[in-house]
């Protein structure tokens, strides 16, 4: 990858990344204006403007706006409003980058900000605010920010009450905010893709042509270090201990040091911080996030989460955290470089858009170990700290901050007991590992042509075999330290749920014997008996609870799942070594997949939420390549229309989605809705009416539109990851549908109409999940 940074004549700063092997391109623009730049009269104004920029601009309206246009391209788009900055970003097929950048530039320079759009998006933000009032992460962040006082205690999300009913006055405030802050010198543009740096620079210069010059009015209220408070709040989510650190120093230096430290903190190998916390049943996961970043100080939050977490356990976690930090300081320079390389490898494996967001918003690893890494570690314990513990059951009193009502209580009096030194371990180790010689041959593996320069093994359950949550989590526990050891030996692996299917993906180098020697131990974990798992608290957003439940609600978990595997790579010797380790686990020649025994009808699930959510999954009527291509084309048509009708025009709620989805190996159309006020039967009627109305719209589709869908689908036929190529090879071997260029090229309008009619007609196959409202 090659990079270039430059500042154009009007002050726009540009960051360009040439990724020669990428098939998709991405763009992100960051504006130095966020919620803290709003006047006290208009809380939520920056958030509202974030929404409105997608609602049309001088050059692009209707279906040509960035969001619906990107959906037609099969791309992704989103935006975020933070305390001191906002960002808009997208990813799409590389050949469409110029058209996407043109739309992004136009919506930032010349948004329409019509009264109709303002009314619509103000209602959407009101629904979002009602959702966030019960969102665990939002309430936790509010409790943390409250400790700093001042402007951070002000309401920022926005609501119908704040915006009022004088649309003209609100429109004037929006235009003034836009005029003050959306100038070239207050923006930064990131572009990445297979285009050359010169081509990317030409796009950046075209983006900048219409950007206004001048200085931005971007003065921020002073943010001081938080009081060293210790607080408990009551939340229905899993329990968490938040340790926040207010750190002085230059922004990029702090970011680079923390990103490297996070590689140590997230390590799961024996002797790591996470391994120790899990062995003592103190913590299941650790997350790091920046609450605030500025030129000379930043505020870091560490979240330690578990099904249950007491105040004394939180004290123990913090003791181990500081002891581990001292051990990291004493690690060798070679070990510091090793963990930086791991962070760089993890970052390189992310999608182009996620990488771009990391570079723009502060999570990309540096090229070298920070110059004063050990000095940073020495100074970190002197940072101002706050502590927050969330509990499901708590004797609390209400406290309002930032527009949210927290159930708050003081930290109980708990004395921290003595802590014995832990034998922390870092890699590379000085100890010499004596591993057995590798076997030469193994049973044959199904082979797929690689699409990435690595050797990849995919191990997954037989088709239509879902795993219970208990089994998946049990194997995850078994695999964590083994996959971490593999990672330190030069390979990598992940146990992940992909499209509702748990699978093991292992990437191996073709010249690293230590990594190959770790492989048998990794694979043996899949033969380990399932261990009982603690109850997991549900997501606080109800539609996510339904999405998590869908795979097992569509296909009942298999009592004794069979395993299958495929290899994607060029190395014959590495493939043979991998196959040998599979002999006790995997069916090397699995039988053809049987027809899926799909569950259907309506199920009401108990969810901790006040909103009503509906998740409708309509399976593909005929499991063949031609029908799959038709379904994918229909989804391209439905996605923007469903959003426009139910989210923009009818404003039924905050979550509105229609898309193609593969769930537990079953292809289908997935409709998702969540509303604070509308019952599920009415939501279902909206879905049915939409599908019926698409009959006439589909009949009016012209050849040019169909050809556009075909072009989008053709770009999606080729897998982007080795694991996807291996999965596709298994599907082909067992006669399951895949998206092929031949099927896409042969699409006709009558074919789409036939598949659509079957989706409508075969309602007995529909799977509908709803939540039982509290």
Residue ranges and their predicted role:
Residues 33-35, 92-94, 188, 193-195, ...:
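A generic structural motif
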Residues 116, 168, 188-191, 195-203, ...:
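Non-catalytic accessory/assembly modules
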Residues 2-4, 146-188, 222, 252, ...:
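Histidine-acidic residue clusters that define the catalytic metal-binding segment
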Residues 242, 266-308, 481-496, 615, ...:
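A structural supersecondary motif
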Residues 31, 58, 63-177, 273-275, ...:
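Acidic/histidine-enriched segments that form metal/cofactor-coordinating
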Residues 339-450, 552-581, 712-774:
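C-terminal regions of mature proteins
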